[in-house]
């Protein structure tokens, strides 16, 4: 229980005190109204199935993620911005992470790949072989309003063979993103 409280407090601290890539702000036009849009950060709440491809270790999960598009870097693949979050499974396995993402907008459809290193605690869940794990994620979402998206995402969590074993875990989630 103390670990869960620590994780919740730590993530809340990260949300309030985000580490900056850059303090530059890009003028972003709202795709609905054509006016300046200052809603460039978001909170993503998600729920789904952790390690759905392993019948013996499958578990429900719930998580939250902060996406901050105010802090970005222009690169060859687009604007990369920070993302921070955590999830916990029904077996008390938890993962806290921070990394990068980029967003590609196709009308109302959004494709958001991300890469996030983090710390994994197995609890009563699957042993992934290391405390240090890496999450590769792709999210497909649809704008349902000026500041809300609904979507689905898939991720793979793995230790990149840093541990003695590397079973990995594949997960899917349903996402609700609120921009502010």
Where are these regions (language model features)?
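Residue-level signature of outer-membrane beta-barrel architecture
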Residues: 66-70, 102-104, 142, 156, ...
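Short loop/turn motifs that connect adjacent beta-strands in outer-membrane beta-barrel proteins
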Residues: 23-40, 54-55, 70-80, 105-111, ...
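Membrane-embedded beta-strands of outer-membrane beta-barrel proteins
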Residues: 62-66, 98-100, 138, 174
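Transmembrane beta-strand segments that form the barrel wall of outer-membrane beta-barrel proteins
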Residues: 42-51, 77-89, 112-121, 153-158
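Helix-adjacent hinge/juxtasegments
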Residues: 91-115
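Solvent-exposed loop/turn segments connecting transmembrane beta-strands
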Residues: 50-60, 86-97, 124-131, 161-169
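Outer-membrane beta-barrel "beta-signal"
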Residues: 58-64, 167-180
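Cleavable N-terminal export/targeting peptides
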Residues: 1-36
């Amino acid at each position: 229980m103390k670990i869960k409280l620590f994780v919740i407090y730590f993530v809340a601290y990260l949300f309030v005190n985000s580490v900056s890539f850059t303090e530059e702000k890009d003028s972003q036009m709202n795709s609905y109204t054509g006016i300046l849009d200052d809603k460039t950060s978001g909170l993503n709440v998600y729920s789904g199935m952790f390690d759905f491809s392993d019948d013996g270790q499958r578990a429900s999960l719930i998580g939250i993620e902060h996406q901050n598009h105010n802090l970005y870097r222009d690169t060859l693949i687009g604007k990369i911005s920070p993302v921070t979050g955590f999830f916990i499974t029904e077996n008390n396995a938890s993962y806290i992470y921070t990394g990068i993402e980029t967003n590609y907008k196709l009308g109302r459809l959004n494709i958001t790949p991300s890469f996030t290193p983090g710390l994994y605690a197995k609890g009563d869940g699957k042993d992934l072989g290391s405390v240090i794990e890496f999450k590769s994620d792709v999210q497909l979402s649809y704008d349902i309003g000026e500041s809300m998206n609904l979507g689905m995402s898939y991720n793979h969590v793995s230790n990149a063979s840093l541990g003695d074993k590397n079973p990995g875990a594949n997960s899917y989630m349903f996402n609700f993103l609120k921009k502010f």
